[in-house]
């Protein structure tokens, strides 16, 4: 009987020549992908296009699992022990931060009941009750004042369009901004009519507490907030 010797396995090494060849082969596709992501991140705002903003949120959300997969890949195919150590640290940090994101998002969802709570860009959700409907929209910063603008029936809150068919009399007395740890209440301090169908209102932060939004409440009822 003749003994068979197993063929040696090919060991792939990532060298400078391999990297250059990879870029030459995939340069065009990578350029298109990066250009698409750059345009989405640059122009993805709720005040411009809600569709582009949602696409932006999907891209940002996919960054975490993609980062974790790449870190695990680096752990499996580490060049040496130094790279392995850094890869393990980066993997742990990525997983911990992703878990923290889900924990904070679930806490915010419990407070507001809105799927915008899983927005990876911000943990500030503006909530306004107009005609019995609670509109929830993400805002980037913690503002001291909020502005509602009505232009011939088109209602905008901080530049974000909420809908049509509204008047200044439909604006509530209070607006809230939900955060992970607390809820900020804004009281209407100023209302001015530009003409018969247009105008604006300014809301000023008046109270901060650990509340959640009830499922149904009268328009502008500050006392309807539920403590948690």
Curated annotation (Swiss-Prot):
What does the entry list under GO cellular component? Answer: host cell Golgi membrane; membrane; viral envelope; virion membrane
Task: Enumerate the subcellular locations listed in this protein's record, separating them with semicolons.
Answer: Virion membrane; Host Golgi apparatus membrane
Q: How does it sit in the membrane?
A: Multi-pass membrane protein
- Kindly give the PROSITE patterns that the UniProt entry links to this protein: COV_M
Q: Name one GO molecular function term.
A: structural constituent of virion
Residues on Virion surface side: 2-25, 78-85
Transmembrane parts of this sequence: 26-46, 57-77, 86-106
Any keyword Acyltransferase?
no
Among CDD domains, the record links this protein to: HCoV-like_M
Assigned keywords, A-Z: Glycoprotein, Host Golgi apparatus, Host membrane, Host-virus interaction, Membrane, Transmembrane, Transmembrane helix, Viral envelope protein, Viral immunoevasion, Viral matrix protein, Virion
Q: Which HAMAP family match?
A: BETA_CORONA_M
Q: Which family does it belong to?
A: Belongs to the betacoronaviruses M protein family.
Quaternary structure, from the entry: Homomultimer. Interacts with envelope E protein in the budding compartment of the host cell, which is located between endoplasmic reticulum and the Golgi complex. Forms a complex with HE and S proteins. Interacts with nucleocapsid N protein. This interaction probably participates in RNA packaging into the virus.
Return the protein name.
Membrane protein
Gene transcribed to yield this protein: M
